[in-house]
Swiss-Prot record:
Belongs to the universal ribosomal protein uS15 family. GO terms for biological process: translation. The gene is rpsO. This is Small ribosomal subunit protein uS15. The lineage of its organism: Bacteria, Pseudomonadati, Thermodesulfobacteriota, Desulfuromonadia, Desulfuromonadales. Part of the 30S ribosomal subunit. Forms a bridge to the 50S subunit in the 70S ribosome, contacting the 23S rRNA. One of the primary rRNA binding proteins, it binds directly to 16S rRNA where it helps nucleate assembly of the platform of the 30S subunit by binding and bridging several RNA helices of the 16S rRNA. PROSITE patterns: RIBOSOMAL_S15. HAMAP family: Ribosomal_uS15_B. GO terms for molecular function: rRNA binding; structural constituent of ribosome. Keywords: Ribonucleoprotein, Ribosomal protein, RNA-binding, rRNA-binding. The keyword Ribosomal protein applies. GO terms for cellular component: cytosolic small ribosomal subunit.
Length: 88
C-alpha cells in the first residue's frame, strides 16, 4: 500500500497548482507508484492471484487516464510519460 508521505511527495511533484490533487498527471503518477509496488510484491509472492487482478485493474485505469490526457493535450501526455518513464 502507498504510504501517505509517499503520496504527498508524488502530489507535490506533479501538481499543477497549490490545491491540485486530482489532475490526470497526479492520478497517473499515483497509479504508477502503486503499480510499481505491486510488481515488486509479485516477484516475492508469485501465487497471489487476487492481488494480480487488482494490478490489472490499476493498469487499465492508468491506461484510460493516459488516453484521456492524450486526447485533451498531447504535450501534457508526452511530459507525463517522459517523467514517469512508462513508455519506451
Amino acid at each position: 500500500m502507498l504510504a501517505t508521505e509517499k503520496k504527498q511527495e508524488i502530489i507535490k511533484a506533479f501538481k499543477k497548482h497549490d490545491s491540485d490533487t486530482g489532475s490526470p498527471e497526479v492520478q497517473i503518477a499515483i497509479l504508477t507508484e502503486r503499480i510499481t509496488y505491486l510488481t515488486e510484491h509479485f516477484k516475492v509472492h508469485k501465487k497471489d492471484h487476487h492481488s494480480r487482478r487488482g494490478l490489472l485493474k490499476l493498469v487499465g485505469q492508468r491506461r484510460r487516464l493516459l488516453d484521456y490526457l492524450k486526447g485533451k493535450e498531447v504535450a501534457r501526455y508526452k511530459a507525463v510519460i517522459e517523467r514517469l518513464g512508462i513508455r519506451r
